[in-house]
């Protein structure tokens, strides 16, 4: 199962703008603004859309009583207990705070969250790979606000991912119908949870069936499982990592992969061995 981190693990909104998050101090969580109290009571009712409520909680300013010497205590409903390397936390937090000093950027950031984000929770692995791009001073994310926001939003499934919004990776093949990316293991100083082996993703360049791309993917990925999970690209998974997936996840992936192949009959010859291996 994918490990998650929250936007509130990094920054918290206040009346004077955004400040660093202090997850360690839990005693001050009792202090709430009137709006935060109402949101907490609504959140307790399991019938409500909790993902939407978490977004509202993040965008709700915290009162000064939640301030500590290190930052602001986030509401317990929107933080995680994920063990995060300090290098990852510092890099992402500093980048966000520097970006949000500009009022126009802050307004666009909040509009993006309220209109596109399905939740404040992100994939820890995706965010770690995003941080690797921030670490690279030559990366275009450091120079283009729009591209940076799209790449950041992709970590939260806020936009449909493309090869341009992916985290740190290498282009290893380019055919007439697709681009293949290689994702190497995340360095320990950025990694949350268990390490993942090298895997690959295929991004089609059009709506046509990427036959040549699939042949190239099969060549570079070797004996890895191919899966389609509904995000517009095909991903490989090393077979030993299938053991970490739940039965529910495996059934869902198999169903989506078979649906994909039913609409792309020419690819059956290339990838059918991977689908059948799950029987």
UniProtKB/Swiss-Prot annotation:
The lineage of its organism: Viruses, Riboviria, Orthornavirae, Duplornaviricota, Resentoviricetes. Its cofactor is Mg(2+). InterPro entries: Rotavirus_NSP2. Keywords: ATP-binding, Host cytoplasm, Hydrolase, Magnesium, Metal-binding, Nucleotide-binding, RNA-binding. It is an enzyme of class 3 (hydrolase). The active site is at residue 233. Its EC number is 3.6.4.-. Residues 214-249 are annotated as: RNA-binding. GO terms for biological process: viral genome replication. Belongs to the rotavirus NSP2 family. This is Non-structural protein 2.
């Amino acid at each position: 199962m994918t490990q998650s981190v929250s936007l509130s693990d990094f920054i918290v909104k206040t009346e004077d703008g955004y400040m660093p998050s202090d997850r360690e101090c839990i005693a001050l969580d009792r202090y709430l603004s009137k709006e935060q109290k109402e949101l907490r009571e609504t959140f307790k009712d399991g019938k409500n859309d909790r993902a939407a409520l978490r977004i509202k909680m993040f965008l709700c300013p915290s009162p000064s009583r939640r301030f500590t010497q290190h930052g602001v205590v986030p509401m317990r409903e929107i933080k995680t207990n994920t063990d995060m390397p300090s290098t990852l936390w510092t890099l992402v937090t500093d980048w966000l705070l520097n970006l949000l000093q500009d009022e126009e950027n802050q307004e666009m950031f909040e509009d993006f969250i309220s209109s596109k984000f399905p939740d404040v929770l992100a994939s820890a692995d995706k965010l770690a790979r995003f941080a690797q791009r921030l670490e690279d001073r030559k990366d275009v994310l450091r120079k283009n606000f729009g591209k940076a926001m799209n790449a950041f939003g992709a970590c939260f499934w806020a936009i449909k991912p493309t090869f341009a919004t992916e985290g740190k990776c290498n282009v290893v093949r380019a055919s007439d119908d697709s681009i293949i990316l290689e994702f190497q293991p995340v360095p320990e100083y950025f990694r949350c949870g268990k390490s993942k082996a090298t895997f690959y993703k295929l991004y089609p360049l059009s709506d046509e069936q990427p036959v040549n791309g699939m042949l190239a993917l099969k060549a570079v990925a070797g004996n890895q499982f191919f899966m389609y999970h509904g995000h517009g690209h095909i991903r490989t998974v090393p077979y030993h990592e299938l053991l970490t997936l739940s039965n529910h996840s495996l059934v869902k992936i198999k169903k989506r992969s078979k649906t994909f192949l039913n609409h792309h009959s020419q690819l059956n010859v290339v990838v059918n061995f991977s689908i059948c291996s799950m029987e």
